[in-house]
From Swiss-Prot:
Keywords: Activator, Developmental protein, Differentiation, DNA-binding, Nucleus, Transcription, Transcription regulation. Its main location: nucleus. Residues 25-67 are annotated as: Disordered. It holds the Pfam family HLH. It comes from the Eukaryota. GO terms for biological process: developmental process; ear development; establishment of epithelial cell apical/basal polarity; mesenchymal to epithelial transition; mesoderm development; muscle organ morphogenesis; negative regulation of hematopoietic stem cell differentiation; neuromuscular process controlling posture. GO terms for cellular component: chromatin; nucleus; RNA polymerase II transcription regulator complex. This is Transcription factor 15.
Length: 199
């Protein structure tokens, strides 16, 4: 019996308009936005009055074309920030499509997405190391037990509750459903198992 390991489709294939920024580009975008003057919010009277009580000149506030330059810089910074925010949101959308959730159409917040992705990566690492064909369908618990030796005792002398992997629990609830399909949690999301007609 042979099994094929299916790889998930990369986000760049599903979302070709997503451009990954390097850390330097992201930091530059953020610092550019924070370095800009907020002179665009002032009225024309404030621009004619000149510098405020603090004396000195503002960045970009000198000369007759100063307010226009400041407005353009602010608009450019806003456009960069919109693009950055859109690319982050698109990346989160791509990540959400790769993480199994119950119910399937559940909307995850950004922090839930990051936490669930981290948990799912740990689960898949345990599946790769140990396989998911354990009797109880919980390879993550087996990995935690073998790493710690046993479930640690609580301060009051009792045993602490065992840690539960969401994905192992989901597998266990579904019974042998995934194991019947080849015993792998590594199926590409979106490929539904063949089911008989509903009654």
């Amino acid at each position: 019996m042979a099994f094929a390991l299916l790889r998930p489709v990369g986000a760049h294939v599903l979302y070709p308009d997503v451009r990954l920024l390097s850390e330097d580009e992201e930091n530059r975008s953020e610092s550019d936005a924070s370095d800009q003057s907020f002179g665009c919010c002032e009225g024309p009277e404030a621009a004619r009055r000149g510098p405020g009580p603090g004396g000195g000149r503002r960045a970009g506030g000198g000369g007759g074309a100063g307010p226009v330059v400041v407005v353009r810089q602010r608009q450019a910074a806003n456009a960069r920030e919109r693009d950055r925010t859109q690319s982050v949101n698109t990346a989160f959308t791509a990540l959400r499509t790769l993480i199994p959730t119950e119910p399937v159409d559940r909307k995850l917040s950004k922090i839930e997405t990051v936490r669930l992705a981290s948990s799912y990566i740990a689960h898949l690492a345990n599946v790769l190391l140990l396989g998911d064909s354990a009797d109880d369908g919980q390879p993550c618990f087996r990995a935690a037990g073998s790493a710690k030796g046993a479930v640690p005792a609580a301060a009051d002398g009792g045993r602490q509750p065992r840690s539960i992997c969401t994905f192992c629990l989901s597998n266990q609830r579904k019974g042998g459903g995934r194991r019947d399909l080849g015993g792998s949690c590594l199926k590409v999301r979106g490929v539904a198992p063949l089911r008989g007609p509903r009654r």
